[in-house]
Each structure stands twice: as C-alpha cells, then as structure tokens.
A protein has these predicted regions:
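Conserved helicase NTPase motor core
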Residues: 3, 8-35, 45, 64-65, ...
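Generic alpha-helical structural context detector
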Residues: 19, 107-110, 114, 162-166, ...
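Walker A/P-loop NTP-binding motif
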Residues: 44-59, 79-82, 255-260
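Conserved P-loop NTPase-based nucleic-acid remodeling module centered on helicase motor cores
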Residues: 60-162
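Coupling/switch/interface segments within P-loop NTPase motor domains and analogous charged loops
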Residues: 131-203
Length: 272
C-alpha cells in the first residue's frame, strides 16, 4: 500500500486536507486551518494526516498532537498508527513508528514543564492538583483570610475557582471577567484579588500546580525567546484538534512555539 493509497478512503475535501503541503520540498508544510461541521469526518481527516506525515518520513518524535481529552488523543493516534502499520505491512516493512507526543494541552504542558523546571524556577517534582483539590486549597485560603465567615453572599469555593480559571485562561482582567460572566460577584472584586494572590502564594509554598498553572507556566516560559525557539524547534508538526475550543492561553502557546505557523494544522468547527 502506497502513501497515496492511504488516502483512498477519504472524500475529495478530506483527501485535500490530509495531503496538504506534505511531500513538497522546502521543509515543514505551511499552516493549515480545516473548518468543518459536526459529522464531516474531522477526526478521520486529522488521523489520516498524521499517518500521511509518517508515511512520508516525518520523525514520529517530532510530531505533536494536541487534543482536549486523553481519549481523543489515544483514539486519533490509534487510528493513525493502524493506517501506517497496514501500509508498512503491505510493503513488507518492519514495525510501524509510534507518535511520542500526543495528549491534552495540560498533559503536554506538564511533561514539558518537568523538563524545563530547573531553568524556569519550578521544582521538577511538583504535584498537580485536580479540580477538587484546587477547590479545597482555595477554600482553606479563603478561610484563613476570613472570607468564609460572616459573609453569606461571598462566592463559594467552586465559583471562586471558576472566576480564577476564567481570568487565567482568557487572559482578561479580573474586573472584566466579573462584569462579563459573574456580575453577581462584582462587589467582591477587591476580596477576590486578595484571595487569588494568597492562593498563588499557597501553591508556590507547597510546590503544587493546578490545571490552569500548567498552561500559564507553559505560556510564560515561552515568553523567553530562547526557550520558545528550543521548544518550537523540537516539533516539525503541531496538529490541534477541536481548535474552536482553544482559549487565549492555549492559542498564545501555539503562536509562541510556531510564530510563522510552519507545520501547524488546526481543525475546528466554527459553528460550535
């Protein structure tokens, strides 16, 4: 089975997207944005694009696949590797290559942060708080500041974390976040600022990161030109599924890694 034959099961538009810029001379393909609706085969197309890259000699260790769930990443890589394995078996080749970097933004961020931790001032052995643990820590800080006593209308821990997360991921000022999404909490802006500062300090003391920190630290380390270049040069191809769900922080991460867009493929649905 040839690389071209791998695309036979796709319709013309899917085939065009799966093959775009691959095999052309001049290095990594130009940036590609695929906009398609539900049920149009976006995942199938992206899986075939990964397979097509591998069959054209792309280094599997230099492909980065970013998704929004671990299950989506695993399924996409399973499909791509099955396609490649079938093609290689038909040609009498050996074991198919394995894509080494695939997962959610948070999982990939955690992996990179552990590698770069000594350079950026993080403890490489940092622990990761899930949402429940983050809420509990925020609630402890809230209590220490006296914001949980005698303030019946002060936001509960889940709401506080939602406000904090929105501000971090959207990269918007707290006042704007409150006005746009939590107007009933606007009267507590000063107290929330104090709470969030203390929450950040508590995480630093305990050497823990919450999910938002995984993106925030990743984005911040890429503000250093040398680090951004090193991380960006590590990957020839960056493929992003469900791009319409990316937030400002995630978009900034991709842009800082690949400022020219070289080798970037983004797939999304503009109706969602």
């Amino acid at each position: 089975m040839s690389a071209a034959a791998v695309l036979d099961g796709l319709n013309p538009r899917q085939r065009e997207a799966a093959a775009f810029g691959i095999g052309a001379e001049g290095g990594a393909p130009p940036p590609l944005l695929v906009v398609a609706g539900a049920g149009s085969g976006k995942t199938k197309t992206l899986s075939h694009r990964v397979a097509n890259l591998l069959l054209h000699g792309a280094d599997p260790g230099r492909i980065l696949l970013l998704t929004f769930t671990r299950r989506a990443a695993a399924e996409m890589i399973r499909r791509a590797e099955a396609i490649v394995a079938a093609a290689m078996a038909a040609g009498g080749a050996a074991t198919a290559p394995t894509v080494e970097w695939a997962g959610t933004f948070h999982a990939v961020g955690a992996r990179l942060l552990r590698e770069w931790a000594p350079v950026i001032g993080l403890d490489p052995a940092f622990s990761i708080l899930d949402r429940s643990d983050a809420e509990d820590l925020l609630d402890l800080v809230r209590g220490d500041l006296g914001l949980a006593k005698g303030k019946a209308r002060f936001p509960k821990k889940g709401t506080c974390l939602a406000i904090y997360s929105n501000a971090v991921n959207a990269q918007n000022p707290l006042g704007e976040v409150l006005a746009s999404h939590f107007p009933w909490c606007r009267e507590w802006e000063a107290e929330l600022r104090r709470l969030f500062r203390a929450y950040v300090e508590a995480k630093q003391r305990q050497a823990v990161l919450d999910y938002d920190d995984l993106l925030l630290w990743w984005a911040r380390m890429l503000e250093e030109e040398g680090i951004a270049r090193a991380v960006g040069d590590r990957f020839d191809h960056v493929l992003i599924d469900e791009y319409q769900d990316t937030n400002a922080l995630q978009a900034a991460i991709v842009l800082r890694m690949k400022p020219e867009g070289s080798g970037v493929t983004a797939v999304g649905d503009d109706a969602q």
